Amino acid sequence: MARGDQQRGEGGQNRGRRDRNAPEERVDSDIVEKLVHINRVAATVKGGRRFSFAALMVVGDQKGRVGYGHGKAREVPEAIRKATEEAKKTMVRVPLRESRTLHHDGYGRWGAGKVMMRAAPPGTGVIAGGPMRAVLETLGVQDVVAKSTGSSNPYNMVRATFEALKVQSSPRQIAAKRGKKVGDILGRRADGASAPDAIEG
């Protein structure tokens, strides 16, 4: 293969190898699939070591539904397929404000991984890195400021992000839970109530 053809096959730009930390995105019908992480694992068996691959996938419809999955197989494509199937089965719905951002701040923790997410005004974009960005983008979030601390393990970061998303509640959901009107909840938020106050107060 000629050098020019090889460069075109890599996207027309000589960028070298793809950043292994950047999620690989695929679109399947209405579902966006992102490969967050893949690694080779070894198991000691009689006669030596057996190698396989473990994949971490995130899928979502970019309309408020998202899921994650883990798959292991002796070949990379099969590991990705298993992880994708599991992710689709575990999809959850998260309420979004104006279909673009979170309703309130969110905090999550899993293992040694901690994440913090804040709603942001239009035009902010998704300010988040690695695994967190993959989850938020497949969910459909367009404006958010997110930060992770502690463990950089992608599995911990993804789980911590989902823990933070679990506490997201729309004004309608909070009003129904408390037996109040939506206007009362919105008025309280306008007065500067924090996310924990809005949910637990």
From Swiss-Prot:
Keywords: Ribonucleoprotein, Ribosomal protein, RNA-binding, rRNA-binding
InterPro entries for this protein: Ribosomal_Su5_D2-typ_SF, Ribosomal_uS5, Ribosomal_uS5_bac-type, Ribosomal_uS5_C, Ribosomal_uS5_N, Ribosomal_uS5_N_CS, Ribsml_uS5_D2-typ_fold_subgr
Segments for region (Disordered): 1-27
Taxonomic superkingdom: Bacteria
GO cellular component entries: small ribosomal subunit
Pfam families found in the cross-reference section: Ribosomal_S5, Ribosomal_S5_C
Quaternary structure and partners: Part of the 30S ribosomal subunit. Contacts proteins S4 and S8.
Protein name (database record): Small ribosomal subunit protein uS5
Source organism of this protein record: Caulobacter sp. (strain K31)
Gene coding for it: rpsE
